[in-house]
Amino acid sequence: IAPHRWTERYEELRMRTENFVAKTGANVKIFLANMGPIPQHKARADFVTSFMQVAAFEVMTNNVFPTVEEAVKAALESGADATIVCSTDATYPELAPAVTKGIKAVNPEMKVFLAGAPSAELKEICDAAGMDDYISVKSNCYETLLRMQKERGMF
């Protein structure tokens, strides 16, 4: 059995991004659509920020968005590769599908993720709106980030 560090795969993710940025000047850009007051989105925004920064992706932090329209407009103007909707389970049924539809109507290539593990009912609603994925403690961090690197052309 060859010895190895358990962190090697994650180090490779980070190095791949750093090398790509050095070579192209471009990185995977993640826009956070933080909905509602700070206590409503902070925990999930912090979690997905750390999740994405494992691969050295650029996370675009921002102020809160009181309306879906403001969040959609800012996400589209950001030039991000992906938007992550951050809020609470109680507000997601109203907010998440609307943000997703608003983004996808103008830029169907932008990925839209939900911060958190949705209920079966919420997942059905969000999937129908075009939500691309869900990021929570149940997510496979390595596989998610690797897939995003592949989609960005880092391989």
Specify the residue positions occupied by each region the protein language model found.
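Peripheral docking tails and interdomain loops at the edges
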Residues: 97, 101-155
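Extracytoplasmic/secreted cell-surface and envelope-processing proteins
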Residues: 93-95
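Non-catalytic terminal/interface segments that mediate subunit docking, oligomerization
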Residues: 1-87, 91
